């Protein structure tokens, strides 16, 4: 046991394992791209596979060729092994390709009138992944539930400055936005329950549908005048409804990203949402268009998921993103720790998928129209 080394204990476990104290031995070259890890938890001993960089600084143990052959025959081809290998390959590709910076600020509304489709998870994880890649992002939590604010561990009690003050009172975004743990690259305009009364408060207000657009434009102009780093993305997490808040988001945005589950009810909802977006574009914002559709909670094993994907691609061939977000406990768990999954458990399948999605979105930014700040 002299060559064995205690590595660390983890609240998250290891690649989906239950939390455990990990005892790791590394053998490089066992699978080519991956290394064999010998993981000892408090309760049991298992053989596992992981990325080579996890093994840095850990003493090596030379398992016998017979043992290696046995492990490869038992594990290679299993769903766990295949997924881990796919995640590692995907991460390497993300690092290799990098993220493209848009030529001008892209304002993206993340919207779906149906709740529970991964809308907020998509908004916060895409924002975090873009910020991690060095791009500057402003995330606007426009949902009265404030889940996007919670996802970053930001307090948003009733009565404190929030997006409500921006839309109703005309407060500058710069006075409300909060810096996250990712630093200046990611700021969040928090939301709270005050926003639920905005329908009544703006009932007779002049230009009530364009309040957020003016606030965003003024913020971008303010950043440019101050000589600060240009804002690459403004991402707006919309509420699951088509009320005045969502209309404000659509009027402010140049693009709409629609996260949707791979189920047939979602197809009906998609048709209704796109019709509403078209109407708003004709009346208030000709630049608005559905630029991206992301399939979430996707189970590639089911025929239903594949059929829905095919239908969406048939009707929206250019908007449907190739990256699909799988069902993942890690994605659901992360907000309880005040982090998006891409930072909380960056090697998990859900985190890898969102990093790929964010990269795909950034690559589309080379040709996608954005909303540049204009001075009057």
Q: Predicted regions span which residues?
A:
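P-loop NTP-binding core
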Residues: 9-17, 22-376
């Amino acid at each position: 046991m002299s060559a064995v080394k205690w590595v660390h204990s983890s609240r998250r476990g290891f690649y989906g394992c239950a939390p455990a104290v990990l005892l790791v031995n590394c053998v490089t070259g066992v699978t080519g791209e991956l290394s064999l890890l010998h993981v000892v938890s408090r309760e049991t001993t298992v053989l596992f596979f992981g990325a080579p960089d996890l093994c840095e600084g850990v003493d090596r143990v030379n398992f016998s060729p017979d043992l290696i052959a046995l492990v490869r025959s038992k594990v290679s081809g299993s769903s766990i092994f295949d997924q881990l290998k796919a995640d590692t390959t995907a991460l390497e590709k993300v690092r290799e390709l990098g993220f493209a910076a848009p030529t001008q600020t892209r304002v993206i509304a993340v919207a779906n009138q149906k709740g529970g489709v991964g809308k907020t998870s998509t908004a916060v994880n895409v924002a975090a992944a873009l910020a991690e890649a060095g791009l500057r992002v402003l995330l606007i939590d426009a949902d009265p539930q404030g889940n996007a604010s919670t996802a970053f561990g930001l307090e948003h009690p009733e009565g404190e400055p929030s997006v409500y003050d921006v839309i109703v009172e005309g407060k500058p975004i710069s006075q409300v936005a909060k810096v996250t743990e990712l630093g200046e690259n990611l700021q969040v305009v928090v939301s709270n329950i005050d926003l639920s009364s905005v329908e009544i408060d703006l009932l007779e207000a002049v230009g009530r549908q364009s309040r957020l657009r003016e606030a965003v434009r003024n913020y971008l102009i303010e950043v440019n005048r101050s000589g600060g780093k240009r804002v690459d993305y403004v991402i707006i997490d919309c509420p699951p409804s088509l009320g005045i808040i969502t209309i404000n988001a659509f009027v402010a945005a140049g693009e709409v990203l629609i996260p949707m589950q791979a189920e047939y009810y979602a197809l009906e909802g998609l048709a209704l949402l796109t019709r509403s977006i078209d109407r708003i574009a004709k009346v208030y914002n000709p630049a608005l268009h559905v630029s991206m559709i992301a399939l979430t909670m996707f189970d590639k094993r089911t025929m239903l998921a594949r059929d829905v994907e095919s239908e969406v691609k048939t009707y929206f061939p250019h908007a449907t993103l190739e990256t699909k977000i799988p069902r993942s406990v890690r994605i659901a768990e992360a907000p309880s720790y005040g982090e998006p999954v891409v930072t909380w458990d960056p090697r998990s399948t859900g985190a890898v998928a969102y990093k790929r999605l964010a990269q795909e979105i950034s690559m589309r930014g080379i040709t996608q129209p954005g909303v540049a700040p204009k001075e009057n």
